[in-house]
């Protein structure tokens, strides 16, 4: 346990289909047919997977009609990751009185996931889907803290809105833990692969003493999280100005030109995905996001 204040028994239980999908994600040798059978046990999940596979995001000329076809069309790893993400998306009901806007939280998480995958495809393509999943889950500890320590976490978020200190610093001071530590424990409780647990735990402070894949994923998610904040995609309670970590950019050979390209293209993709899965469009239009991203790009501070 990384967090001393969250009782794992208070963490929402994963539904049976989610548990099956997690076991499926753990078994990389599972055949396409078996993966398809697991997903097709849940009609709603199947419908959402097919909707995404047929969406304009994947730019397919021909429609797919089965999960197996979707795995062939967009890749088995992509379907596994989407299934896992969609299952977890449904575990936490949105709260109208939440410490933060839960819909905007998921928009931020999806944005981070998509930036992470896009960058990882340039750095280590074999880790692209895992970077997506980690990006999606990187702030899951915030939802658990809002659920289990609601009033205390509301006070944390209210302080963070002032923008004078990072959210995780305020969490540590007021709660004795951080959302990254809680996120680690949530994923451990759900028995997700250890790679995800450790990468979520380290996403604010990637350290190279851990496994190389974990370092790459946590480092890329760190950069992706910054880009998501800079382009104003969703919100997760942190108003502290974000810095692009120059040491990580150098480590992964990512130039500011690459960041420029991503910040110009990824927001449109995020809008498409969010609309497909029912989160809807952001309050600010697409062009507002892109224009603001362009203005902010010139203000990037690279932390050396």
Q: Which residues fall in each region the model found?
A:
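Conserved alpha-helical "signature site"
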Residues: 1-242
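Divalent metal-dependent phosphate-bond-processing catalytic cores, especially two-metal-ion Mg2+/Mn2+ enzymes
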Residues: 188-198, 217-304
């Amino acid at each position: 346990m990384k967090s001393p204040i969250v009782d794992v028994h208070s963490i929402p239980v994963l539904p049976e289909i989610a548990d099956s999908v997690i076991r499926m994600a753990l078994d990389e040798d599972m055949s396409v047919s078996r993966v398809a059978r697991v997903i097709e046990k849940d009609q709603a999940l199947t419908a959402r997977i097919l909707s995404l596979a047929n969406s304009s995001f994947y730019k397919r000329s021909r429609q797919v009609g089965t999960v197996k076809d979707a795995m062939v069309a967009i890749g088995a790893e992509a379907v596994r990751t989407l299934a896992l993400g969609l299952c977890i998306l449904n575990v936490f009901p949105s709260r109208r009185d939440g410490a933060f806007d839960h819909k905007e939280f998921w928009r931020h998480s999806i944005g981070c996931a998509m930036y992470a995958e896009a960058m990882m495809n340039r750095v280590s393509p074999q880790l692209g889907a895992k970077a997506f999943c980690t990006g999606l889950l990187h702030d899951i500890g915030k939802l658990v803290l809002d659920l289990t320590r609601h009033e205390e976490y509301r006070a944390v978020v209210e302080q963070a809105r002032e923008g004078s200190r990072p959210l995780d610093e305020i969490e540590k001071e007021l709660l004795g833990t951080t959302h990254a530590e809680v996120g680690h424990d949530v994923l451990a409780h759900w028995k997700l692969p250890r790679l995800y647990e450790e990468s979520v735990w380290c996403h604010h402070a990637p350290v190279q003493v851990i496994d190389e894949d974990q370092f790459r994923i946590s480092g890329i998610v760190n950069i992706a999280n910054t880009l998501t904040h800079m382009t104003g995609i969703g919100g997760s309670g942190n108003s502290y100005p974000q810095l692009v970590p120059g040491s990580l950019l150098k480590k992964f050979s990512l130039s500011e030109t690459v960041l420029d390209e991503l910040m110009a293209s990824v927001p449109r993709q995020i809008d498409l995905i969010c609309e497909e899965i029912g989160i809807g469009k952001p309050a600010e239009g697409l062009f507002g996001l892109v224009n603001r991203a362009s203005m902010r790009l010139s203000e990037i501070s690279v932390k050396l």
